[in-house]
Amino acid sequence: MLVYQDLLSGDELLSDSFPYKEIQNGVLWEVDGKWVVQGAVDVDIGANPSAEGADADADEGVDDQTVKVVDIVDTFRLQEQPPFDKKQFVTWVKRYIKLLTPKLEGEQQETFKKNIEGATKFLLSKLSDLQFFVGESMGDDTSLVFASYKEGATDPIFIYFAHGLKEVKC
């Protein structure tokens, strides 16, 4: 199994269990998320509680709480952040480029520098529709993960900066 960690914080942000599609000249990865239900599941095993001596109205101590979560957010314990306005986002991108560029090597660094402007413009065009997430450590100087919904979709897509991820074999 491959896990993708944030190069800046070391937080696990993605794994190969979630296939990605390269967009914006490979600078961004798009990953499909899904809403899933977690918690107790009501299973009817065909038993008759009254025949077993149990009170039909009695709570048998089972917590029937179910929660809908997005699989990627839950799996990697992503933490949602407040939305950014254009000025805040541009400030974050500039700081991110400054922090990430020295960690990249040779061709990877050149590709990142060459294509980051287009990727930034792409994200700026969707800014009002994006949700922002960071990894579990919630550091200020880390990669952001962006989520949005395509028109008419019920499940979100997640967008990652590909160059900000380090592949680790587990």
Swiss-Prot record:
InterPro entries: Mss4-like_sf (IPR011057), Mss4/transl-control_tumour (IPR011323), TCTP (IPR034737), Translation_control_tumour_CS (IPR018103), Translational_control_tumour_p (IPR018105). Pfam families: TCTP. The keyword Metal-binding does not apply. Its main location: cytoplasm. Belongs to the TCTP family. Involved in calcium binding and microtubule stabilization. This is Translationally-controlled tumor protein homolog. One of its GO terms (cellular component) is cytoplasm. It comes from Fragaria ananassa.
